């Protein structure tokens, strides 16, 4: 099994992610956003990095993405 290459950093979240956006901030200040594409009904987790946003994963439900956020427990 090969590893998937990391997603490229995008300057902004694509306009196709046109549904509600929920921002999560960890104790260390790392910012994540969960977005929704209203056409496909898919939710996507994005991580804020210097220079833009990195797409981490897409899922049918936003609840499937929350476990990927490191809340600095």
Residues of each region from the PLM?
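Negatively charged, low-complexity tracts enriched in Asp/Glu with abundant Ser/Thr
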Residues: 2-26
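Intrinsically disordered, low-complexity, compositionally biased regions/tails
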Residues: 6, 23, 33, 55-56
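Short aromatic-glycine-(Arg/Gly/Cys) micro-motifs in beta-strand/loop hairpins
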Residues: 31-52
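A short, charged, amphipathic alpha-helix used as a generic interaction element across diverse proteins
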Residues: 19, 43, 50-52, 57-73
């Amino acid at each position: 099994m090969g590893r998937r290459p990391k997603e490229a950093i995008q300057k902004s979240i694509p306009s196709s992610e046109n549904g509600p956006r929920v921002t999560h901030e960890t104790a260390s200040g790392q910012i994540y956003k969960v977005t929704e594409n209203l056409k496909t009904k898919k939710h996507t987790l994005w991580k804020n990095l210097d220079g833009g946003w990195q797409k981490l994963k897409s899922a049918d439900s936003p609840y499937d993405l929350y476990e990927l956020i490191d809340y600095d427990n």
